[in-house]
Amino acid sequence: MTRPTHPNALIWLLLSIAIIALDQATKAWVLTSLPEYIPVPVIHGFWNWYRSYNTGAAFSFLSDAGGWQMWLFIALALGISGLLTFWLSRTPRREWRSALPYALIIGGGIGNVIDRFLHGHVVDFIQWYVGSYYWPSFNLADSAIVAGAIGIGLLSLFDSKHSPKTP
């Protein structure tokens, strides 16, 4: 006797592929259209296009470590993406609250891995600022990773399956 199979959430990898494609398309535009390290205002006083490069991780962590960090970040991104893909294969398709953040993180992580393989660094181009305070430059892959991490955090806070039961 076989048990009924339920569709898993691997279909959400289509979102990951879309994020990778959009991320790489925007970075191709940046590399052919924006000058290096010169702000191009989008919204004065808040947002610039600003082509820059990051050999490190978030907030340029380990960016001056000498090159070995590229392989560390590639291994981490591929390992985490592999784990999240495995989790998607075990997640029922209807559980979009789990599948969506996993797909976002996978797409963003692989988008930045492609940069590291192609260029030896990640291409950043979105710069937000207020007055003299500048947030570190980032890209669409970074945005997907952050949105996915926030989604996982919110899910863990508000998921009714894991909340204490009241008598």
Curated annotation (Swiss-Prot):
<keyword id="KW-0812">Transmembrane</keyword>
<keyword id="KW-0645">Protease</keyword>
<dbReference type="Pfam" id="PF01252">
    <property type="entry name" value="Peptidase_A8"/>
</dbReference>
<comment type="similarity">
    <text>Belongs to the peptidase A8 family.</text>
</comment>
<keyword id="KW-0472">Membrane</keyword>
<feature type="transmembrane region" description="Helical">
    <location>
        <begin position="138"/>
        <end position="158"/>
    </location>
</feature>
<feature type="active site">
    <location>
        <position position="124"/>
    </location>
</feature>
<dbReference type="InterPro" id="IPR001872">
    <property type="entry name" value="Peptidase_A8"/>
</dbReference>
<keyword id="KW-0064">Aspartyl protease</keyword>
<keyword id="KW-1133">Transmembrane helix</keyword>
<dbReference type="GO" id="GO:0005886">
    <property type="term" value="C:plasma membrane"/>
</dbReference>
<keyword id="KW-0997">Cell inner membrane</keyword>
<protein>
    <recommendedName>
        <fullName>Lipoprotein signal peptidase</fullName>
        <ecNumber>3.4.23.36</ecNumber>
    </recommendedName>
</protein>
<comment type="function">
    <text>This protein specifically catalyzes the removal of signal peptides from prolipoproteins.</text>
</comment>
<feature type="transmembrane region" description="Helical">
    <location>
        <begin position="98"/>
        <end position="118"/>
    </location>
</feature>
<comment type="pathway">
    <text>Protein modification; lipoprotein biosynthesis (signal peptide cleavage).</text>
</comment>
<feature type="transmembrane region" description="Helical">
    <location>
        <begin position="10"/>
        <end position="30"/>
    </location>
</feature>
<keyword id="KW-1003">Cell membrane</keyword>
<dbReference type="GO" id="GO:0006508">
    <property type="term" value="P:proteolysis"/>
</dbReference>
<dbReference type="GO" id="GO:0004190">
    <property type="term" value="F:aspartic-type endopeptidase activity"/>
</dbReference>
<keyword id="KW-0378">Hydrolase</keyword>
<feature type="transmembrane region" description="Helical">
    <location>
        <begin position="68"/>
        <end position="88"/>
    </location>
</feature>
<feature type="active site">
    <location>
        <position position="142"/>
    </location>
</feature>
